[in-house]
């Protein structure tokens, strides 16, 4: 991944757009539709590189998945008819694919090997392996912490598990494994984390009880699964880049339609409101996965903010671009309790600070977050996504604060979650 992209976009940004389907929900919809015997339609899925890795793996297990315009048609023989794969299951750059399938394949008892790219090979897997081994999963990694993960058949038992980190991926790995146990599993969370697995289990007829910080599964829950059609809302993590772009670019007025606003994911909306940003939600729908249209207008004199506690997991993937937003506030902002950023595609505490500081902004990395001072774009250094899609898009948004073009190395990383990101940003420039 060595592509360079020159970003030359100026404001104001004006217009109405949709963003690609939610990445987290697309992964889970493919997994659940594949487990269920019969046909499921997944509408407006995200077909970035990460979700394609998930699709490819289920095809190897014997599931027929067809792309049909803006939907996926999943025809599955059901989990009981899955084939043993006779090759390594390649997860690419996808932590979601790797960690959730570690649980799912352990539960299924299918002999398999999960392995990803160089970035995935550096990301910790012990947080998933520990609870799975407590469930009697036969799963091993390099140094008990890294891919490749080798899975062998076993009989999964239920556990009572106190989460060590607020991680939806760890929680979901346990939940997927627990589907195949004839015991009850109880998970106690530290903080609220995204709950798409729980809401989508119900959508596919799998019984599950969820209170605020406690989740309980039913014995032999997999036997209840049924195929279902699912409409994937727009990804709020992708919408975040346009929300921030409109807030920091004079005279901008942007509306994003059909964005998922699940309360476990909508931290960026809470943060923008606390900072005094001009943001309005309308056309709201309710249901398992609520949606809204979001209108954002340029807002000078944003108020500084401290982001900590339960707000952090609700905005974890958006924190790099939120850090950029905080540079435009009238005082110093702080992000705390965000150690989870260290184990993303890159250490996002360091990469966010390093890349924005190169451009003249003033950010100090801390052990669990960032201190962000009011600062401006001062120098047109060449920056680098470091193969992290969210860093690449954040830097493209930062370029709106420069009067000169900005060169970003390894920009094609954005295709992981948002193919067509740059043309969509340019569309708003042209409509302005």
Swiss-Prot record:
Q: Name one Pfam family in it.
A: EPSP_synthase
Biological processes, Gene Ontology terms: amino acid biosynthetic process; aromatic amino acid family biosynthetic process; chorismate biosynthetic process
Pathway(s) served: Metabolic intermediate biosynthesis; chorismate biosynthesis; chorismate from D-erythrose 4-phosphate and phosphoenolpyruvate: step 6/7
Q: Where in the cell is it found?
A: Cytoplasm
* Cleavable signal peptide: none
- UniProt-annotated catalytic positions: 317 (proton acceptor)
Keywords (alphabetical) are:
Amino-acid biosynthesis, Aromatic amino acid biosynthesis, Cytoplasm, Transferase
Question: One MF term from GO for this chain?
Answer: 3-phosphoshikimate 1-carboxyvinyltransferase activity
Tagged with keyword Cytoplasm: yes
Enzyme Commission number, as recorded: 2.5.1.19
Indicate the enzyme's highest-level EC class.
Answer: transferase
Classification via SUPFAM superfamilies: EPT/RTPC-like
Outline what the protein does.
Catalyzes the transfer of the enolpyruvyl moiety of phosphoenolpyruvate (PEP) to the 5-hydroxyl of shikimate-3-phosphate (S3P) to produce enolpyruvyl shikimate-3-phosphate and inorganic phosphate.
Fetch the PANTHER family from UniProt. AROM/DEHYDROQUINATE SYNTHASE (PTHR21090), PENTAFUNCTIONAL AROM POLYPEPTIDE (PTHR21090:SF5)
Record protein name field: 3-phosphoshikimate 1-carboxyvinyltransferase
Primary gene name = aroA
